[in-house]
């Protein structure tokens, strides 16, 4: 396996160290966090990076602050990344070489699970470190974590973030369903992991209903938001954001933030806006679409630009590249409304970030969004994805300045209940309980069943 050089570099504001000796012991234990298919330092909104990346990085940093030693394992995608990235005291990102740096689609990554697992084992042996617990994220990492759990004889905590059967039950028109092979892998993880962590009670219900999970093995941990990064701006800051984005100061602005794929519903918003402009052609409306193509959207990267043009609304729609949090905050502040027409969201981090920025949210009543939004107080929940219904909900806020402003003020208060520090404390309790009990032992041929 290639080893990184001895120099120190900079990447996304963190130091990259090619060699870093590990502490042999720590009062709180050492955690192996596994995120095979996407790195937590990748830009959200690019490729497969999204809320899960923010979740892993944010909780890991908070766990490090609590005294845990956290090693996050991800698949290397660039030779310049270095072997070890020091994100913070106690928190390291380990780039494991498994297959070529480029050229593999997300659907092809399962072919590298053995190589990735081998790389983790080699790293632990070479560094002479042992782990108290494994926390895997997403189904591919769950499969890797399952093997390491049995090898290291430590408990495995797993967070799915999304589930094949849940996604397939709410597909957008034209979206490709998740394969049965993924469903089987998810079932195996559910059957073998020591603890399952979900973002909401709805996520818990989905595991029980679709995967026959034992509810006693499921913990609900609400994600958080960086309220220091995302906070309401002054009128002057809002004006500056609009000027930088090329948006008229007196226009009503609707923003979409997320990956450009049908599952996230950008087509719903664009059709709703076309409906709004048809009924109210004289209103000064602008739409900001912030994000890059991902998943099935990679097959047609200009699909939504083409749709805006076909609908005749391209003069009022601006597509923005994904941007880091410090720049994304200005998009939220520039907007009067943030729209989230997703077909499924395990939580809805964008909703919390937008509300923390003082912007009301109009979102689909799907997944965890009813938890992140206080319907009628900090935003509006829309049943279904009919563009006409979305046009009605959006227009109601565009036309009522007092209601929209009041919702924005309420949104800030509502978002304050979501904290990464609180999430990490809850995870710590789960970890300590799992470590105390140790990995459960299952004997018999059903451990790898495909039921």
From Swiss-Prot:
The keyword Metal-binding is assigned to this record: yes
BP terms from Gene Ontology: liposaccharide metabolic process; mycothiol biosynthetic process
GO molecular-function terms, A-Z: acetylglucosaminyltransferase activity; D-inositol-3-phosphate glycosyltransferase activity; magnesium ion binding
Binding residues for 1D-myo-inositol 3-phosphate: 37, 48-53, 106, 138, 162, 182
E.C. code: 2.4.1.250
InterPro entries recorded: Glyco_trans_1, Glyco_trans_4-like_N, Glycosyltransferase_grp1, Mycothiol_biosynthesis_MshA
Signal peptide as annotated in the record: none
UniProt entry keywords in alphabetical sequence: Glycosyltransferase, Magnesium, Metal-binding, Transferase
Catalytic activity from the UniProt record: 1D-myo-inositol 3-phosphate + UDP-N-acetyl-alpha-D-glucosamine = 1D-myo-inositol 2-acetamido-2-deoxy-alpha-D-glucopyranoside 3-phosphate + UDP + H(+)
One Pfam family matching this protein: Glycos_transf_1
Binding site for Mg(2+): 332-333, 335, 359
Family as reported in the entry's similarity comment: Belongs to the glycosyltransferase group 1 family. MshA subfamily.
Role played: Catalyzes the transfer of a N-acetyl-glucosamine moiety to 1D-myo-inositol 3-phosphate to produce 1D-myo-inositol 2-acetamido-2-deoxy-glucopyranoside 3-phosphate in the mycothiol biosynthesis pathway.
Self-association and partners: Homodimer.
Protein name: D-inositol 3-phosphate glycosyltransferase
Organism in which the protein naturally occurs: Corynebacterium kroppenstedtii (strain DSM 44385 / JCM 11950 / CIP 105744 / CCUG 35717)
Organism phylogeny: Bacteria, Bacillati, Actinomycetota, Actinomycetes, Mycobacteriales
Gene that specifies this protein: mshA
